[in-house]
Amino acid sequence: VRDAYIAKPHNCVYECARNEYCNNLCTKNGAKSGYCQWSGKYGNGCWCIELPDNVPIRVPGKCH
């Protein structure tokens, strides 16, 4: 498990405005919790706590 930005296909973050949206998204994917990281490295994106290793995360490089 790891703490990371959960990624959509093609290495894009889930953009967000509310913590509730990210918490639901992250826990649905097996994480302990999640919140909306505002003005982070990739803009406003969902950050998950203890996300399982099989779930894709945002990595350096382009979002297509």
Curated annotation (Swiss-Prot):
GO molecular function annotation: sodium channel inhibitor activity; toxin activity
Principal cellular location given in the protein's record: secreted
Entries under SUPFAM superfamilies matching the protein: Scorpion toxin-like (SSF57095)
Note on domains (UniProt): Has the structural arrangement of an alpha-helix connected to antiparallel beta-sheets by disulfide bonds (CS-alpha/beta).
Keyword Hydrolase part of the UniProt annotation: no
GO-annotated biological processes: defense response
Family: Belongs to the long (4 C-C) scorpion toxin superfamily. Sodium channel inhibitor family. Alpha subfamily.
Tissue: Expressed by the venom gland.
Cell compartments where the protein resides: Secreted
Location of the LCN-type CS-alpha/beta domain: 2-64
Superkingdom of the source species: Eukaryota
Protein name per the record: Alpha-like toxin BmK M2
GO cellular component labels: extracellular region
Disulphide bridges: C12-C63, C16-C36, C22-C46, C26-C48
Pfam short name (any one): Toxin_3
Organism annotation: Olivierus martensii
Keywords per UniProt: Disulfide bond, Ion channel impairing toxin, Neurotoxin, Secreted, Toxin, Voltage-gated sodium channel impairing toxin
